[in-house]
Amino acid sequence: MKSAKLGFLLRFFIFCSLNTLLLGGVNKIAEKICGDLKDPCKLDMNFGSCYEVHFRYFYNRTSKRCETFVFSGCNGNLNNFKLKIEREVACVAKYKPPR
């Protein structure tokens, strides 16, 4: 994923995550805009659309496990982790903040 696009997605993810804490009453609007971006682990794995080869981790909702896949280098989504520990911090319940 190109750094500018990844930066935008990360900022959007942070906005969606913090919106609940900061704006309280606007939760319904944020939910419509952000949807599952609050939790990258709810997103399906996406290979991307380029032709590079990057081995990455993603959370498989069906098997409830961390699995590897080959990322193409651009596009894709936030369910795409370079390190297994990054995926665990994002997707394992004991590391997630309480809701």
From Swiss-Prot:
UniProt keyword annotation of Ligase present: no
Record bears the keyword Signal: yes
Top-level taxon of the source organism: Eukaryota
Native source organism of the sequence: Homo sapiens (Human)
Family annotation (Pfam families): Kunitz_BPTI
GO cellular component, one term: extracellular region
Keyword annotations: Disulfide bond, Protease inhibitor, Secreted, Serine protease inhibitor, Signal
Main location class: secreted
Record's subcellular location: Secreted
Official protein name in the record: Kunitz-type protease inhibitor 4
An example Gene Ontology molecular-function term: serine-type endopeptidase inhibitor activity
Signal peptide location: 1-24
Cystine connections: 41-91, 50-74
Sequence ranges assigned to domain BPTI/Kunitz inhibitor in this UniProt record: 41-91
